[in-house]
């Protein structure tokens, strides 16, 4: 226990300092002065504000020893005398602080004595004699214990440091004055080390407020309202960190009202009533009261109702701030008395401006100069996600982390320095590390963010946007949403928005729910995403949901007629006697369901419609195919439109050739018609077998008529080469999708074995298109060739020149009186190919093949017992 004396406090303090300096106490390893009664850190004296006051008071009283002539002042004991042990003051033992390495005990004594000199010099400015005595005593003690005289060195170092510190103070003071003039929240700045940086950065003027341009700039009425001295009751609603509390404090400070602030987290009905009572008393003196309630949504219904009478009577002006939707969390009666202003989260540009301002004022607020590059600033603004408090707290943590890296000695020097030491801290994106990681997404179960996210997911699925669907699902899962809730909502989507358009959607959603239930997070994420994307890509139909709502509305407006008798169940004999189930037609007993004539609705509403299936949106796959097809057709149309109207010279030549071929076709048709008419006249009196041949000739005539009609259509559109080619192919019964060789039936006109008598009459051919030399007594015909030579009755050679046009050969679809076994050979190697003509009982053929075009005509007649017709097959 320490000993107590009756001397006054000033004497105790001064004697304490004298005792510590004269007894040559030793500084231990932890940096403390030790004696028998106490352990005390000499650097902690300045932390005690009461000790400061006592020290200064004692310094003023010490002037008695300097020949003070004031007789009314009581005599004080001489503080320079060596105190007795009874004058020692004992202090409670202080907790040990982190240690730092001491050079040696002798130097420690010197440093401690020098520190005592500095303390006495700073605190006893009015008593120079006492300071000199103390310095002498300290120096004597140092010499006696260590034999070292550091007085000269200490004085020199102190002088140099004071000069440097004075220059630093001048520069810092000038910078501080500029900052205080620039920002209103620094005007009455008082450094509070315990306040977080975000609180110290809170603006006090609307000119310094960042963000909410739509509210403060876009709406001038609201801005004037906030700046006016007369305020209504209003609620500020917005996400965290957007400036609700700051704006409310700025607006309240501009009015002439008393301001009372409460937080709904730690207050209740009692606190509200106390504020209302005080406001009622001040109102009697003509001054109103503003009650600001932060997080007002935390109040329950009863607590909110307490505010209603005071607001309605004008006793208080309520300003509330909330992060939850007021329409859900606040009473309707309270909302009717307060205007709600919705605030948006800060933009990335707003946060970058705020971060740069924070970097500018931190030298004044925290004795640190933060230096950040643009990349780090943009990354921090991105991670903050509209929350100003998050951005400033990251900077605050970076500064505090830098302080932890300092040694104990550096912290003590900085703490007790009056020079305003400012240290530079360079912060890069890499150095901040995990501080730039997003800790959480905006998500509050049961709040606005929760319902907004699930609404966005549902509408993305309905709109068949798989990309957006995946984003919202993953964001909800990463925000901490219950996965079972998400799949329950997807079950609803499968029946509401997809329905009958894809009957596998609902079973898949139920399977996803079971998978989540069995597996759990995080393994179930793939199952949830798979189901969500499938629902987004599926076809859509809301027929079930639409007609359910329609029928429900109908039932609310109309009475319900009874169930028809034939549809009622009759499990008992009595009910059967009543006629229940009579005349019911069991559908499975009818093979033809059209025989079922019963109706299934009551008679009054049998014509009402209560369901009709409608496909509102096809699947993504079907739409993609349709879009591709539409795109291809549009490209073809564009190509046709972009083609020049004037054709090139090769195209014009091709068109002229086609027109010539059409003219040749007309001439060939005339020849065929004449030959057919002659054959009909000759065969009119022949046998029944020949009559069948006559019928076939009539069919040929019909085909020729069709060819003539087609040619007439071609003549009307002879300017379009593509259409002409198409009609020519159609007239020759050609299909480009089929193989090249097509068959056209043309029976032989004459039978060489049985009808030799008629050869001389029929072998007359019409006027040839081009002259050809043909030498044979049974064949006198001309086709579009330059030279045809028939050697004998068994074989003939047909030679074509190089300028032979194979398109014209298609017109010679009928060659009469070809001898049996005759061969037709083409001499041109590049264009033709030789084939033998074989004669059988039912078929004769002539084949002429070209590398560019293959035109084939053939015919097979039914066998006739007496005189079967001999078909001729022309293969081109």
Swiss-Prot record:
Composition skew (Polar residues), residue ranges: 835-849
What Gene Ontology cellular-component terms does the record carry?
A: nucleus
Sorted keywords for this record are: ATP-binding, DNA damage, DNA replication, Hydrolase, Metal-binding, Nucleotide-binding, Nucleus, Phosphoprotein
> What does the record give as EC number?
3.6.1.-
Annotated ATP binding lies at 240-246
Q: Which reaction does it catalyse?
A: ATP + H2O = ADP + phosphate + H(+)
Task: Tell me one Pfam family matched here.
Answer: MgsA_C
Its top-level enzyme class, in one word, is hydrolase
GO MF term list: ATP binding; ATP hydrolysis activity; DNA binding; enzyme activator activity; metal ion binding; single-stranded DNA helicase activity
Compositional bias annotation for Low complexity: 56-85, 104-175, 626-647, 714-731
Question: Where in the cell is the protein located?
Answer: Nucleus
Return the annotated region ranges for Disordered.
56-175, 621-647, 714-737, 833-876
Q: Where in the sequence does UniProt note compositional bias of the Basic and acidic residues kind?
A: 850-863
Q: Which GO biological process categories is it annotated with?
A: DNA synthesis involved in DNA repair; DNA-templated DNA replication
Query: What function does the entry list?
Result: Functions as a modulator for initiation or reinitiation events during DNA polymerase delta-mediated DNA synthesis. Has an intrinsic ATPase activity that functions as a sensor of DNA damage or of arrested replication forks and regulates the extent of DNA synthesis.
* Family stated for the protein in its record: Belongs to the AAA ATPase family. RarA/MGS1/WRNIP1 subfamily.
In Swiss-Prot or TrEMBL terms, this protein is called ATPase WRNIP1
Please name the source species.
Answer: Dictyostelium discoideum (Social amoeba)
